[in-house]
Amino acid sequence: MTTHDTPLKGRICLVAGATRGAGRAIAVQLGTAGATVYVTGRTTRGEPSEVGRTTETIEETAELVTAAGGEGIAVPTDHLEPERVRALVDREHGRLDVLVNDLWGGEHLIGSAFGRKSWELDLADGLRMLELGVRTHAVTSHLAVPLLIRNPGGLLVEVTDGTAAYNGTRFRENLYYDLAKNAPIRMAFGLAKELAEYGGTAVAVTPGWLRSEQMLASFGVTEENWRDALGKAPDFGISESPVYVGRAVAALAADPDRHRWTGRSLSSGHLAAEYGFTDADGSRPDCWGFLVAKETGTPAVADHR
């Protein structure tokens, strides 16, 4: 491989929340670009997290990063525990070039919550969503950013659900989920202001309708036959594989002019149009454009892929 093939060779990345889904794909794509990638999560081969899935582990993610051409290093970490995050940061070669906050793991809390008023929900579950989706990001940034700013050009990516434009005028069906997914957008905006004097860049990035392992399981399909779900959910045709957002973050990390995006809320579809990459199947889904168009008409999925 040439340096053109591995533009991130020699870079140190941390993907916090990389057990599965978007986080795993981001880590693998950073590895494909040649980076050393620390991957964290709570599910290990010896112990599952509260998510309750044992089919994906943080060790497996690290192995996938290495197989892709990078160096994957698994560090089991609960990002609600500051001391464990501090120990993680202390391991990172004395430098950090890319920090990706993809911390969540609250899907098991939202299944019965959508469509219900906030006061009808279990308060402990609602507050747990905020712990998992907001506090984890705050703890990790607080402890990792001092390492990120040691060298100019650091990149911080807050992964969330929805763009600022979309979420800003739409309620995400559940108050606690809405708060958990809008907070990272504001974190990216605020951190962009704070990182500016150090030459750092902070952005929020969202996938579209993500064909994560859990989403595929909910439809009873796999990545190979996901279109079988279109009979009961035609709009699932606008969905995207995790590879798409992984390529989006890798493209940002490799862009020497990435600071032009700082403080902004970006989507995988937007970045695909900018950088010219595609999803794994060669398509370029634009989920958020499709959803906006659907509010005023009946758009064809094919027009947004």
Question: What are these regions, as identified by a protein language model?
Answer:
Residues A33, G190-G200, P256-H259:
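Active-site-adjacent segment of SDR/Rossmann-fold oxidoreductases
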Residues S141-H142, F189:
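A short, exposed helix-loop element centered on a Lys and neighboring polar residues
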Residues T55-E56, P76-L88, L123:
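The beta1-alpha1 cofactor-binding region of Rossmann-like NAD(H)/NADP(H)-dependent oxidoreductases
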Residues G105-L109, K117-L123, I149, G153-E197, ...:
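Catalytic loop of short-chain dehydrogenase/reductase
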Residues D5-T44:
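Canonical Rossmann dinucleotide-binding motif of NAD(H)/NADP(H)-dependent dehydrogenases/reductases
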Residues R11, G70-E71, R95-L96, L148-G162, ...:
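Active-site loop of short-chain dehydrogenase/reductase
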Residues A204, E224-R305:
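C-terminal helical subdomain
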